[in-house]
Amino acid sequence: LKYLRNMIKISIIGGGGNVGYHLTAILLNAENIELIEVYNRTLDKIQYLKNDTSITTNLNQLKEADIYIICVADDAIVEVSKKLNFNNKLVVHTSGSVAMEELKCKANKGVFYLLQSFSKDKKIDFSNIPICIEATSKTDLELLKVLAKTISKNCYHINSEQRRNLHVSAVFVNNFVNHLYFIGNQICEDNNVPFEILHPIIKETASKIETLSPFDAQ
């Protein structure tokens, strides 16, 4: 692959969201990666990048890149992808629940799904994030693998159906569990007990899953 010898040029579409924010941060400092441009509907959320890379609000005049990474909300992926008129370029989205075929552009298609919960105010260690990739061609899949392994040790080839079900599993172990924390916190507040008293048992329960099956840890 020529990308093993040359810089991979990346354009991020939707740099103002949580995923786009963190992906921009890691790619700006990644080896053999050139983040040539970040797009967002409004400049205010990406203005801070003006000294590091090109920023734009115009989808019709994006710079030429090897990979265009769409980091917008799931329900905006179709509309955004329709506006990308590229040939022989790779366009990928980062959604866990949207099929690769939902990319409605002429370009080559793929998925670059980061299986992690992102918040702008919490720094993320990318080295252990599972990155699930999919592409319409072996060449593009190899390119995504090179990109993934540049920022993480964990790269998986996962198809759209597997990814959709994986996303459901992630909702159970992340969003549902976090809601249980919320309920626990409410009970503590109602009884004037500090929620911090539960931190050790929460951490112990979470750490068990690395050495025990969920059934055995129950």
Specify the residue positions occupied by each region the protein language model found:
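Internal alpha-helical scaffold of NAD(P)-dependent oxidoreductase catalytic cores
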Residues: D52, N108, K123-H167, V171-E210
